[in-house]
């Protein structure tokens, strides 16, 4: 999975978010909190998902900006995994009265999305699908399996779209082969 490491990715994200948040905080003269979805499942592979990095990044932000203390950092999943994020999302959807499947079918975890062109289109039209074989997709599907819900995202492989049960079976085989 180290092939998916983008050097300094979360620092880049946090720099952009911090600058916007600080601008809003200064304009409104209020405290602004930013949230990041970094989680424990990524600690081993992505150094910028660790608490030590977050602390150092926030300290640098505060040292380098006037009134930076007006921006707070919220990382609720730092000690959790994709399943914890999914459980929280399910709970939030219930509280807000919104359709979980409608929300989550519009999300993407895949590092290898697959574009399938419409056969009738000569203008490049088509649909994007998530792969189900990359590590991030396997972790996502595993979280849905643990939650006991089908993942509403549409999956595909090199042959075309596949039903969720195919993606689920693939992940279950991987988990079984690793004794999980």
Residue ranges and their predicted role:
Residues 1-180:
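Nucleotide-activated chemistry modules centered on ATP-dependent adenylation/adenylyltransferase
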